[in-house]
Amino acid sequence: EKETLDGLADQNEMDRYCYYVAGVVGEMLAELFCDYCPELEPKKELLLQLSVSFGQALQMTNILKDVWTDRERGACWLPGTTLQKHGVLFKTLAPENGGEPFRSFMLEMLATASGHLSNALSFTLLLPRNQTGIRRFCLWALGMSLLTIKKIWKNPNFTHGSQVKISRRSVKITALATSFFAMSNTALKLLFKTSALGLKKKEIKTPLDSISDLTIPKKQN
Protein backbone atom coordinates (compact mmCIF):
# COMPACT_ATOMS: atom_id res chain seq x y z
CA GLU A 1 0.00 0.00 0.00
CA LYS A 2 1.16 3.51 -0.84
CA GLU A 3 1.58 5.71 2.22
CA THR A 4 -0.97 8.53 2.22
CA LEU A 5 -3.02 10.51 4.72
CA ASP A 6 -6.16 9.58 2.79
CA GLY A 7 -6.24 6.29 4.70
CA LEU A 8 -7.63 2.96 3.54
CA ALA A 9 -11.00 2.77 1.82
CA ASP A 10 -12.91 0.83 4.47
CA GLN A 11 -12.68 -1.91 7.10
CA ASN A 12 -12.45 -4.60 4.42
CA GLU A 13 -9.37 -2.92 2.97
CA MET A 14 -7.91 -2.63 6.46
CA ASP A 15 -8.52 -6.36 6.94
CA ARG A 16 -6.69 -7.08 3.71
CA TYR A 17 -3.79 -4.79 4.63
CA CYS A 18 -3.47 -6.44 8.04
CA TYR A 19 -3.58 -9.85 6.38
CA TYR A 20 -0.73 -9.01 4.02
CA VAL A 21 1.53 -7.65 6.76
CA ALA A 22 0.56 -9.84 9.74
CA GLY A 23 -2.14 -12.40 8.93
CA VAL A 24 0.20 -14.38 6.71
CA VAL A 25 2.63 -14.56 9.63
CA GLY A 26 -0.17 -15.98 11.78
CA GLU A 27 -0.87 -18.61 9.12
CA MET A 28 2.82 -19.46 8.94
CA LEU A 29 2.88 -19.95 12.72
CA ALA A 30 -0.18 -22.22 12.51
CA GLU A 31 1.54 -24.31 9.83
CA LEU A 32 4.75 -24.50 11.86
CA PHE A 33 2.91 -25.44 15.05
CA CYS A 34 1.01 -28.20 13.21
CA ASP A 35 4.23 -29.57 11.74
CA TYR A 36 5.85 -29.50 15.18
CA CYS A 37 2.85 -31.00 17.00
CA PRO A 38 1.20 -33.75 14.91
CA GLU A 39 -1.68 -33.89 17.43
CA LEU A 40 -2.81 -30.50 16.10
CA GLU A 41 -3.61 -31.87 12.64
CA PRO A 42 -7.35 -32.38 13.37
CA LYS A 43 -7.54 -28.73 14.47
CA LYS A 44 -5.49 -27.34 11.59
CA GLU A 45 -8.33 -25.80 9.60
CA LEU A 46 -9.66 -23.97 12.67
CA LEU A 47 -6.16 -22.89 13.67
CA LEU A 48 -5.56 -21.40 10.23
CA GLN A 49 -8.81 -19.45 10.40
CA LEU A 50 -8.06 -18.09 13.87
CA SER A 51 -4.42 -17.40 13.01
CA VAL A 52 -5.49 -14.52 10.76
CA SER A 53 -7.08 -12.82 13.78
CA PHE A 54 -3.88 -13.47 15.73
CA GLY A 55 -1.97 -11.40 13.21
CA GLN A 56 -4.66 -8.74 12.81
CA ALA A 57 -5.05 -8.20 16.57
CA LEU A 58 -1.36 -7.37 16.89
CA GLN A 59 -1.26 -5.28 13.72
CA MET A 60 -4.36 -3.25 14.61
CA THR A 61 -2.90 -2.58 18.05
CA ASN A 62 0.24 -1.19 16.41
CA ILE A 63 -1.78 0.90 13.95
CA LEU A 64 -3.86 2.47 16.70
CA LYS A 65 -0.88 3.00 19.02
CA ASP A 66 1.21 4.58 16.27
CA VAL A 67 -1.57 6.59 14.61
CA TRP A 68 0.04 9.98 15.28
CA THR A 69 3.60 8.80 14.62
CA ASP A 70 2.45 7.47 11.25
CA ARG A 71 0.65 10.72 10.54
CA GLU A 72 3.86 12.69 11.07
CA ARG A 73 5.46 10.77 8.20
CA GLY A 74 2.39 11.10 5.97
CA ALA A 75 0.81 7.69 6.49
CA CYS A 76 -2.64 6.59 7.62
CA TRP A 77 -3.81 2.97 7.85
CA LEU A 78 -7.28 3.74 9.22
CA PRO A 79 -10.53 2.81 7.40
CA GLY A 80 -11.94 5.83 5.60
CA THR A 81 -15.63 4.94 5.80
CA THR A 82 -15.39 4.47 9.57
CA LEU A 83 -13.63 7.82 9.95
CA GLN A 84 -16.39 9.44 7.89
CA LYS A 85 -19.10 7.76 9.96
CA HIS A 86 -17.73 9.47 13.06
CA GLY A 87 -17.18 12.79 11.29
CA VAL A 88 -13.38 12.63 11.43
CA LEU A 89 -11.33 14.25 8.67
CA PHE A 90 -8.01 12.72 9.62
CA LYS A 91 -6.04 14.37 6.82
CA THR A 92 -6.38 17.79 8.45
CA LEU A 93 -6.82 16.70 12.08
CA ALA A 94 -4.28 17.82 14.66
CA PRO A 95 -3.65 15.38 17.54
CA GLU A 96 -4.89 17.86 20.15
CA ASN A 97 -8.15 18.48 18.27
CA GLY A 98 -9.54 14.94 18.14
CA GLY A 99 -12.43 15.59 20.48
CA GLU A 100 -15.51 13.38 20.73
CA PRO A 101 -15.57 12.35 17.03
CA PHE A 102 -12.06 10.88 17.17
CA ARG A 103 -12.74 9.37 20.58
CA SER A 104 -15.81 7.51 19.31
CA PHE A 105 -13.89 6.38 16.22
CA MET A 106 -11.05 4.99 18.32
CA LEU A 107 -13.45 3.14 20.61
CA GLU A 108 -15.01 1.41 17.60
CA MET A 109 -11.57 0.45 16.32
CA LEU A 110 -10.61 -0.87 19.76
CA ALA A 111 -13.75 -3.02 19.82
CA THR A 112 -12.72 -4.56 16.50
CA ALA A 113 -9.16 -5.12 17.69
CA SER A 114 -10.50 -6.70 20.90
CA GLY A 115 -12.63 -9.08 18.85
CA HIS A 116 -9.58 -10.23 16.93
CA LEU A 117 -7.68 -10.52 20.20
CA SER A 118 -10.39 -12.82 21.55
CA ASN A 119 -10.00 -15.04 18.48
CA ALA A 120 -6.24 -14.93 18.94
CA LEU A 121 -6.63 -16.22 22.49
CA SER A 122 -8.85 -19.04 21.19
CA PHE A 123 -6.08 -19.85 18.70
CA THR A 124 -3.53 -20.03 21.51
CA LEU A 125 -5.73 -22.17 23.75
CA LEU A 126 -6.01 -24.78 20.98
CA LEU A 127 -2.29 -25.43 21.29
CA PRO A 128 -1.37 -28.49 23.41
CA ARG A 129 -1.13 -27.60 27.09
CA ASN A 130 2.19 -29.36 27.43
CA GLN A 131 3.69 -27.12 24.73
CA THR A 132 4.33 -24.29 27.15
CA GLY A 133 7.07 -22.76 25.03
CA ILE A 134 4.92 -21.98 22.00
CA ARG A 135 2.01 -21.08 24.27
CA ARG A 136 4.15 -18.52 26.10
CA PHE A 137 5.36 -17.13 22.79
CA CYS A 138 1.76 -16.39 21.79
CA LEU A 139 0.54 -15.34 25.24
CA TRP A 140 3.24 -12.75 25.78
CA ALA A 141 2.35 -11.05 22.49
CA LEU A 142 -1.38 -11.15 23.24
CA GLY A 143 -0.91 -9.93 26.80
CA MET A 144 1.08 -6.89 25.71
CA SER A 145 -1.43 -6.18 22.95
CA LEU A 146 -4.29 -6.27 25.45
CA LEU A 147 -2.48 -3.93 27.84
CA THR A 148 -1.87 -1.47 25.00
CA ILE A 149 -5.51 -1.63 23.89
CA LYS A 150 -6.58 -0.98 27.48
CA LYS A 151 -4.27 2.06 27.74
CA ILE A 152 -5.68 3.49 24.51
CA TRP A 153 -9.24 2.77 25.73
CA LYS A 154 -8.53 4.81 28.86
CA ASN A 155 -7.08 7.67 26.80
CA PRO A 156 -8.48 7.48 23.23
CA ASN A 157 -7.61 11.12 22.57
CA PHE A 158 -3.91 10.60 23.28
CA THR A 159 -1.67 12.89 21.25
CA HIS A 160 1.57 10.89 21.21
CA GLY A 161 2.37 7.19 21.26
CA SER A 162 4.43 7.58 24.43
CA GLN A 163 1.18 8.27 26.33
CA VAL A 164 -0.12 4.75 25.63
CA LYS A 165 3.16 2.87 25.80
CA ILE A 166 3.10 0.07 28.37
CA SER A 167 5.76 0.11 31.06
CA ARG A 168 8.58 -2.40 31.46
CA ARG A 169 7.00 -3.40 34.75
CA SER A 170 3.75 -4.23 32.97
CA VAL A 171 5.65 -6.28 30.40
CA LYS A 172 7.38 -8.26 33.16
CA ILE A 173 4.13 -8.87 35.03
CA THR A 174 2.42 -10.00 31.82
CA ALA A 175 5.24 -12.41 31.02
CA LEU A 176 5.21 -13.84 34.54
CA ALA A 177 1.43 -14.19 34.80
CA THR A 178 0.92 -15.79 31.39
CA SER A 179 3.89 -18.10 31.93
CA PHE A 180 2.58 -19.20 35.32
CA PHE A 181 -0.85 -20.07 33.90
CA ALA A 182 0.38 -21.28 30.51
CA MET A 183 -0.94 -24.83 31.00
CA SER A 184 -4.40 -23.85 32.26
CA ASN A 185 -6.99 -22.76 29.71
CA THR A 186 -9.45 -21.89 32.47
CA ALA A 187 -6.97 -19.66 34.29
CA LEU A 188 -5.88 -17.97 31.07
CA LYS A 189 -9.47 -17.22 30.06
CA LEU A 190 -10.09 -15.69 33.48
CA LEU A 191 -6.84 -13.71 33.37
CA PHE A 192 -7.62 -12.18 29.98
CA LYS A 193 -11.28 -11.59 30.85
CA THR A 194 -10.31 -9.76 34.03
CA SER A 195 -7.66 -7.72 32.22
CA ALA A 196 -10.18 -6.72 29.54
CA LEU A 197 -12.89 -5.53 31.95
CA GLY A 198 -14.63 -2.47 30.54
CA LEU A 199 -13.54 -3.04 26.96
CA LYS A 200 -16.24 -3.48 24.35
CA LYS A 201 -15.62 -6.34 21.95
CA LYS A 202 -16.93 -6.84 18.44
CA GLU A 203 -17.53 -10.46 17.54
CA ILE A 204 -15.29 -11.37 14.61
CA LYS A 205 -16.49 -14.27 12.51
CA THR A 206 -13.83 -16.44 10.90
CA PRO A 207 -12.84 -16.87 8.19
CA LEU A 208 -13.08 -13.19 7.26
CA ASP A 209 -15.08 -12.68 4.06
CA SER A 210 -12.89 -9.68 3.21
CA ILE A 211 -9.80 -11.86 2.74
CA SER A 212 -11.37 -15.16 1.67
CA ASP A 213 -9.58 -14.97 -1.70
CA LEU A 214 -6.19 -14.48 -0.03
CA THR A 215 -6.02 -17.11 2.70
CA ILE A 216 -4.25 -20.45 2.52
CA PRO A 217 -6.53 -22.90 0.67
CA LYS A 218 -7.56 -26.11 2.38
CA LYS A 219 -5.46 -29.05 1.34
CA GLN A 220 -7.30 -31.72 -0.56
CA ASN A 221 -7.22 -35.24 0.84
Regions found by a protein language model. Give the residues of each.
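Catalytic cores of Mg2+-dependent Asp-rich isoprenoid enzymes
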Residues: 1-57, 69-221
